[in-house]
C-alpha cells in the first residue's frame, strides 16, 4: 500500500470526489473484470511491459521523447497515467469524463515528426490505439502470469471489451474486442518497428 501512496504523492489524488456521486458505478462497475485485474499488484509489471512494447512504434517514441516530462519528472508522469487508469476504471462517470478530458488536453499539443520523417500526433486515433491496446494487452498478460488466478477466456475477452469501452471516449481506433484479436493486432501492426 505504501507504494501506491508514494506513487500518488507525485500528482493529483484519484477518486477524490467519488463519494459525491452515490450509486454511480462509473463506466464499468464493481462486477467488471477490470476492477479485479487493475486492483492487483501485477499491473505494475504490466505497466513496465507496456512501456517496452510501446517503444516499438517510432512515432509514439518520438512524441514521448519530444513532448513528455518523463525524463525530468518520471514519477509525476507515472502518477498522471496511474490517476487516469484509476479514475477511468473505478471512478463515477463525472470522474471518468474528467479524466478523459485531462488526457485530451494533454495530448492536443503533442505533434511533430519522427526520426523516420513521419508525422505524429497524440490525437491521431491510430496512435492512441497503439498505446491503449498495448497497455490493455500488457495488463492482461501480467495478470495471467502473476495474478492470483488466471482469467478464463471469457473473462479475458470481457477485460479487453471493458477497456475498449473506456478508450473509445478518447477516440482511439481501431480497438480489438477480444483477447485473441488484441494479440494479433499488436503482433501484426504495420507501424511497429522490428529490428533483428
Where are each of the predicted segments found?
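Mature, function-bearing regions of proteins
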Residues: 1-130, 136-196
Amino acid at each position: 500500500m505504501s507504494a501506491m501512496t508514494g506513487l500518488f504523492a507525485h500528482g493529483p489524488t484519484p477518486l477524490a470526489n467519488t463519494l459525491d456521486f452515490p450509486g454511480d458505478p462509473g463506466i464499468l462497475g464493481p462486477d467488471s473484470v477490470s476492477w479485479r485485474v487493475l486492483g492487483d499488484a501485477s499491473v505494475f509489471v504490466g505497466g513496465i511491459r507496456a512501456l517496452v512494447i510501446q517503444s516499438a512504434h517510432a512515432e509514439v517514441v518520438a512524441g514521448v521523447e519530444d513532448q513528455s516530462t518523463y525524463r525530468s519528472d518520471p514519477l509525476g508522469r507515472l502518477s498522471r497515467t496511474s490517476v487516469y487508469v484509476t479514475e477511468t476504471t473505478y471512478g463515477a462517470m463525472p470522474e471518468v469524463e474528467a479524466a478523459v478530458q485531462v488526457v485530451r488536453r494533454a495530448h492536443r499539443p503533442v505533434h511533430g515528426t519522427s526520426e523516420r520523417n513521419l508525422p505524429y500526433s497524440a490525437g491521431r486515433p491510430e496512435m492512441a490505439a497503439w498505446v491503449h491496446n498495448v497497455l490493455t494487452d500488457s495488463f492482461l498478460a501480467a495478470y495471467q502470469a502473476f495474478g492470483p488466478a488466471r482469467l478464463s477466456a471469457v473473462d479475458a475477452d470481457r477485460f479487453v471489451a471493458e477497456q475498449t469501452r473506456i478508450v473509445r471516449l478518447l477516440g482511439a481506433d481501431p480497438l480489438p474486442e477480444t483477447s485473441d484479436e488484441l494479440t494479433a493486432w499488436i503482433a501484426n501492426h504495420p507501424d511497429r518497428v522490428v529490428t533483428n
